[in-house]
Protein backbone atom coordinates (compact mmCIF):
# COMPACT_ATOMS: atom_id res chain seq x y z
CA UNK A 1 0.00 0.00 0.00
CA UNK A 2 1.37 3.41 -0.97
CA UNK A 3 1.96 5.89 1.85
CA UNK A 4 -0.49 8.76 2.23
CA UNK A 5 0.66 12.03 0.72
CA UNK A 6 0.65 14.68 3.43
CA UNK A 7 -0.87 17.96 2.32
CA UNK A 8 0.61 20.75 4.40
CA UNK A 9 -0.89 24.04 5.49
CA UNK A 10 1.63 25.80 3.22
CA UNK A 11 0.56 23.62 0.25
CA UNK A 12 -3.04 24.64 0.84
CA UNK A 13 -2.22 28.36 1.14
CA UNK A 14 0.00 28.36 -1.96
CA UNK A 15 -2.60 26.45 -3.98
CA UNK A 16 -5.29 28.84 -2.78
CA UNK A 17 -3.20 31.85 -3.77
CA UNK A 18 -2.76 30.22 -7.19
CA UNK A 19 -6.52 29.85 -7.57
CA UNK A 20 -7.08 33.49 -6.60
CA UNK A 21 -4.37 34.60 -9.05
CA UNK A 22 -5.95 32.66 -11.91
CA UNK A 23 -9.60 33.42 -11.23
CA UNK A 24 -10.59 35.43 -8.12
CA UNK A 25 -11.17 35.16 -4.39
CA UNK A 26 -14.83 34.40 -5.13
CA UNK A 27 -13.72 31.15 -6.82
CA UNK A 28 -11.88 29.93 -3.76
CA UNK A 29 -13.67 27.04 -2.09
CA UNK A 30 -12.69 23.75 -0.49
CA UNK A 31 -13.65 21.69 -3.55
CA UNK A 32 -11.54 23.83 -5.93
CA UNK A 33 -8.55 23.60 -3.60
CA UNK A 34 -8.96 19.84 -3.16
CA UNK A 35 -9.21 19.35 -6.92
CA UNK A 36 -6.05 21.41 -7.49
CA UNK A 37 -4.20 19.43 -4.80
CA UNK A 38 -5.63 16.12 -6.04
CA UNK A 39 -6.95 15.23 -2.60
CA UNK A 40 -10.17 15.27 -0.60
CA UNK A 41 -11.31 18.32 1.36
CA UNK A 42 -10.26 16.61 4.60
CA UNK A 43 -6.68 18.04 4.67
CA UNK A 44 -8.08 21.54 4.21
CA UNK A 45 -10.30 21.31 7.26
CA UNK A 46 -7.61 19.49 9.23
CA UNK A 47 -5.31 22.47 8.71
CA UNK A 48 -7.88 25.28 8.91
CA UNK A 49 -10.81 25.59 11.31
CA UNK A 50 -12.87 27.35 8.64
CA UNK A 51 -12.72 28.76 5.14
CA UNK A 52 -12.57 32.21 6.75
CA UNK A 53 -9.34 31.22 8.49
CA UNK A 54 -7.97 30.04 5.14
CA UNK A 55 -9.05 33.30 3.48
CA UNK A 56 -7.11 35.22 6.13
CA UNK A 57 -4.03 33.09 5.43
CA UNK A 58 -4.43 33.80 1.71
CA UNK A 59 -4.68 37.54 2.40
CA UNK A 60 -1.57 37.36 4.57
CA UNK A 61 0.32 35.55 1.81
CA UNK A 62 -0.92 38.02 -0.82
CA UNK A 63 0.30 40.88 1.36
CA UNK A 64 3.68 39.18 1.66
CA UNK A 65 3.86 39.00 -2.14
CA UNK A 66 2.99 42.70 -2.32
CA UNK A 67 5.71 43.50 0.24
CA UNK A 68 8.14 41.67 -2.06
CA UNK A 69 7.16 44.02 -4.90
CA UNK A 70 7.80 47.02 -2.65
CA UNK A 71 11.16 45.74 -1.51
CA UNK A 72 12.34 44.87 -5.02
CA UNK A 73 11.32 48.24 -6.44
CA UNK A 74 13.10 50.11 -3.64
CA UNK A 75 16.19 47.87 -3.82
CA UNK A 76 16.54 48.33 -7.58
CA UNK A 77 17.18 52.02 -6.94
CA UNK A 78 15.73 53.17 -10.26
CA UNK A 79 13.44 55.68 -8.55
CA UNK A 80 13.64 57.71 -5.35
CA UNK A 81 12.29 55.60 -2.48
CA UNK A 82 8.91 57.31 -2.19
CA UNK A 83 8.29 57.09 -5.92
CA UNK A 84 9.45 53.46 -5.91
CA UNK A 85 6.66 52.57 -3.48
CA UNK A 86 4.08 54.03 -5.87
CA UNK A 87 5.63 52.28 -8.85
CA UNK A 88 5.60 48.98 -6.92
CA UNK A 89 1.93 49.42 -6.02
CA UNK A 90 1.05 50.00 -9.67
CA UNK A 91 3.29 47.15 -10.88
CA UNK A 92 1.63 44.81 -8.37
CA UNK A 93 -1.79 45.87 -9.71
CA UNK A 94 -0.71 45.16 -13.28
CA UNK A 95 1.08 41.85 -12.67
CA UNK A 96 -1.05 40.44 -9.85
CA UNK A 97 -4.50 41.77 -10.73
CA UNK A 98 -6.56 39.43 -8.59
CA UNK A 99 -4.25 39.68 -5.58
CA UNK A 100 -4.36 43.48 -5.90
CA UNK A 101 -8.15 43.38 -6.00
CA UNK A 102 -8.18 41.10 -2.96
CA UNK A 103 -5.99 43.46 -0.95
CA UNK A 104 -6.91 46.92 -2.20
CA UNK A 105 -10.26 46.80 -4.02
CA UNK A 106 -12.53 45.15 -1.49
CA UNK A 107 -15.43 46.41 0.58
CA UNK A 108 -14.08 47.36 4.00
CA UNK A 109 -17.20 49.01 5.37
CA UNK A 110 -17.70 46.17 7.87
CA UNK A 111 -14.17 46.41 9.29
CA UNK A 112 -13.57 48.03 12.65
CA UNK A 113 -11.12 50.57 11.26
CA UNK A 114 -13.36 51.57 8.33
CA UNK A 115 -12.92 55.21 7.42
CA UNK A 116 -9.51 55.54 9.04
CA UNK A 117 -6.58 56.32 6.83
CA UNK A 118 -3.61 55.37 8.93
CA UNK A 119 -0.39 54.35 7.23
CA UNK A 120 2.32 52.01 8.44
CA UNK A 121 5.48 53.40 10.05
CA UNK A 122 7.73 52.44 7.14
CA UNK A 123 5.57 54.42 4.71
CA UNK A 124 5.43 57.41 7.02
CA UNK A 125 9.23 57.35 7.43
CA UNK A 126 9.63 57.39 3.65
CA UNK A 127 7.15 60.27 3.26
CA UNK A 128 8.82 62.19 6.09
CA UNK A 129 12.25 61.76 4.46
CA UNK A 130 10.85 62.82 1.10
CA UNK A 131 8.90 65.87 2.25
CA UNK A 132 10.09 67.07 5.64
CA UNK A 133 6.49 67.94 6.52
CA UNK A 134 5.03 67.79 10.03
CA UNK A 135 3.15 64.63 11.01
CA UNK A 136 -0.44 65.67 10.19
CA UNK A 137 0.44 67.51 6.98
CA UNK A 138 2.63 64.62 5.88
CA UNK A 139 -0.20 62.12 6.39
CA UNK A 140 -2.61 64.19 4.30
CA UNK A 141 0.06 64.72 1.62
CA UNK A 142 0.50 60.95 1.42
CA UNK A 143 -3.26 60.38 1.30
CA UNK A 144 -3.45 62.66 -1.74
CA UNK A 145 -0.52 60.91 -3.46
CA UNK A 146 -1.90 57.48 -2.60
CA UNK A 147 -5.35 58.35 -4.01
CA UNK A 148 -3.69 59.26 -7.31
CA UNK A 149 -1.49 56.15 -7.35
CA UNK A 150 -4.45 53.96 -6.43
CA UNK A 151 -6.44 55.37 -9.35
CA UNK A 152 -3.72 54.42 -11.83
CA UNK A 153 -3.28 51.01 -10.19
CA UNK A 154 -7.03 50.36 -10.34
CA UNK A 155 -7.07 51.13 -14.06
CA UNK A 156 -4.30 48.55 -14.54
CA UNK A 157 -5.97 45.95 -12.30
CA UNK A 158 -9.29 46.22 -14.13
CA UNK A 159 -7.74 46.27 -17.59
CA UNK A 160 -9.19 49.73 -18.21
CA UNK A 161 -5.85 51.25 -19.15
CA UNK A 162 -2.37 50.03 -20.00
CA UNK A 163 0.42 52.59 -20.04
CA UNK A 164 4.15 52.12 -20.49
CA UNK A 165 6.30 52.48 -17.38
CA UNK A 166 7.97 55.69 -18.55
CA UNK A 167 4.56 57.35 -18.80
CA UNK A 168 3.53 56.06 -15.37
CA UNK A 169 6.80 57.35 -13.93
CA UNK A 170 6.23 60.76 -15.49
CA UNK A 171 2.66 60.91 -14.18
CA UNK A 172 3.81 60.14 -10.64
CA UNK A 173 6.55 62.75 -10.87
CA UNK A 174 4.11 65.37 -12.16
CA UNK A 175 1.59 64.64 -9.39
CA UNK A 176 4.30 64.64 -6.70
CA UNK A 177 5.86 67.90 -7.90
CA UNK A 178 2.43 69.50 -8.21
CA UNK A 179 1.58 68.57 -4.63
CA UNK A 180 4.98 69.79 -3.40
CA UNK A 181 4.23 73.14 -5.03
CA UNK A 182 0.75 73.18 -3.50
CA UNK A 183 2.32 72.57 -0.07
CA UNK A 184 4.91 75.32 -0.63
CA UNK A 185 7.87 72.93 -0.95
CA UNK A 186 9.43 74.21 -4.17
Per-region residue spans from a language model:
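N-terminal intrinsically disordered/low-complexity leader segments
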Residues: 1-7, 184-186
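Helix-turn-helix
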Residues: 11, 15, 19-53, 57
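Secondary-structure edge/capping motif, primarily at the C-terminal ends of alpha-helices
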Residues: 70-74, 103, 107, 156-160
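Conserved alpha-helical segments that form or flank metal/cofactor-binding pockets of metalloenzymes
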Residues: 95-101
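Amphipathic alpha-helical packing segments from all-alpha helical-bundle domains
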Residues: 108-135, 139-144, 170-184
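Amphipathic C-terminal alpha-helical segment
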Residues: 102, 147-164, 178-186
Amino acid sequence: MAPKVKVTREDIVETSVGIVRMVSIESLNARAIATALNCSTQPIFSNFASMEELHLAVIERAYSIYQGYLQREVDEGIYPTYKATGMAYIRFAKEERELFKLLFMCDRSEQQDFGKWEFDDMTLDIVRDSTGLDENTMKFFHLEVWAYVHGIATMFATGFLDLDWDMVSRMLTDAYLGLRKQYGME
